[in-house]
């Protein structure tokens, strides 16, 4: 192999390693059996959510993962592999791919990385079932508002009772 080819591959490994390091979550899928239209549709959905999907050679992915200390991913880097990287939303790639896989049976989640830790298929699908960030924040807000609301109702009830007595 020529020095230029080796340098090019090292550049690709470095770029993939940087993506692994900077990503909040990574979902690794086998896209074998999907039509071009399905892959295009999946890429569009992911792009709309701020997620980048790339098809990268398994050998480059394996070296990049080892370079950033992500051991245990070698078994998922077999066959046709696409990788979805999300820098902001941890849940988005898992949720979109899991939903898409319900319609496109050929799409198979192989594994992933959540906040720098190697994750199994089960962990990725469990993550996909969580509400998105806005949903979680609204749940938290309603939980925080409940005690204040209850105190307000109690004060109102006491005030109404005092008015009836007077």
Swiss-Prot record:
A GO biological process held by the record: translation
Keyword annotations for this protein, in alphabetical order, are: Ribonucleoprotein, Ribosomal protein, RNA-binding, rRNA-binding
InterPro entries from the xrefs? Answer: Ribosomal_uL10, Ribosomal_uL10-like_sf, Ribosomal_uL10_bac, Ribosomal_uL10_bac_type
Q: Which Pfam families match?
A: Ribosomal_L10 (PF00466)
Does the entry feature the keyword RNA-binding, yes or no? yes
Listed under GO cellular component are:
ribonucleoprotein complex; ribosome
Gene Ontology terms for molecular function: large ribosomal subunit rRNA binding
Q: Which family does the record claim for this protein?
A: Belongs to the universal ribosomal protein uL10 family.
Q: Which NCBIfam families match?
A: PRK00099.1-1 (NF000955)
Q: How does it assemble?
A: Part of the ribosomal stalk of the 50S ribosomal subunit. The N-terminus interacts with L11 and the large rRNA to form the base of the stalk. The C-terminus forms an elongated spine to which L12 dimers bind in a sequential fashion forming a multimeric L10(L12)X complex.
Task: Describe the function of this protein.
Answer: Forms part of the ribosomal stalk, playing a central role in the interaction of the ribosome with GTP-bound translation factors.
Protein name per the record: Large ribosomal subunit protein uL10
Q: Which organism is it from?
A: Enterococcus faecalis (strain ATCC 700802 / V583)
